[in-house]
C-alpha cells in the first residue's frame, strides 16, 4: 500500500471513534513517527436515518484489513518507459555530459514582456476606470435626488 495512503488509513483508524468503544489507538501505533500530523479527534458519528447502524461501525477496519492483506501494489511503469532512468535524475558521476544534452528552447522574451506590460496596464486602467465611475456616481447622487 502507498505509504501516504497507509498513513491516511492509520490516522483514520486512530482518530475515528468506534460506536462499540474499541480503542484502536492502543493496539496500533502510527507508522511514521517522524512526521506525525496534528489531528484532533472528531465527535462520534451517530447515524440519523437509513440503513446505517452500529453493526456498520467496523466497515472501515475491514477495508483496512483487506488492504493490508493485499499488500503493496506492483510497480507498474507506463508504456514505453522500459526501465530507463527518468530524465530528471542526475547523470552518473562517471558519465559524460554529452550523453545528456541540454534542451534549448527558443523563448520570445521581448513579446512576453510586452504582453505582460500590456496586461498590467489594462488591469490598472480597468481598476482606475471603476474607481472614477464610482466617484462620478457619488458626486452626481445629489443631482439625481438619491
Swiss-Prot record:
Signal peptide: none annotated. It is found in: Host nucleus, Host nucleolus. InterPro entries: Herpes_US8A. Its main location: host cell. Residues 63-93 are annotated as: Disordered. GO terms for cellular component: host cell nucleolus. Residues 84-93 have a biased composition (Low complexity). Belongs to the HHV-1 US8.5 protein family. It comes from the Viruses. Keywords: Host nucleus, Phosphoprotein. This is Protein US8.5. Phosphorylated. It comes from Human herpesvirus 2 (strain HG52) (HHV-2).
Amino acid at each position: 500500500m502507498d505509504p501516504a495512503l497507509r498513513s491516511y488509513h492509520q490516522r483514520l483508524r486512530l482518530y475515528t471513534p468506534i460506536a462499540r468503544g474499541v480503542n484502536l489507538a492502543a493496539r496500533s501505533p502510527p507508522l511514521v513517527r517522524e512526521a506525525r500530523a496534528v489531528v484532533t479527534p472528531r465527535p462520534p458519528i451517530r447515524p440519523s436515518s437509513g440503513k446505517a447502524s452500529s453493526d456498520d461501525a467496523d466497515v472501515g477496519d475491514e477495508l483496512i484489513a483487506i488492504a493490508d492483506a493485499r499488500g503493496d501494489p506492483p510497480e507498474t511503469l507506463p508504456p514505453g518507459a522500459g526501465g530507463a532512468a527518468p530524465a530528471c535524475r542526475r547523470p552518473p558521476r562517471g558519465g559524460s555530459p554529452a550523453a545528456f544534452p541540454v534542451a534549448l528552447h527558443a523563448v520570445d522574451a521581448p513579446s512576453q514582456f510586452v504582453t505582460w506590460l500590456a496586461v498590467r496596464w489594462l488591469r490598472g486602467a480597468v481598476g482606475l476606470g471603476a474607481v472614477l465611475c464610482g466617484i462620478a456616481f457619488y458626486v452626481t447622487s445629489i443631482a439625481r435626488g438619491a
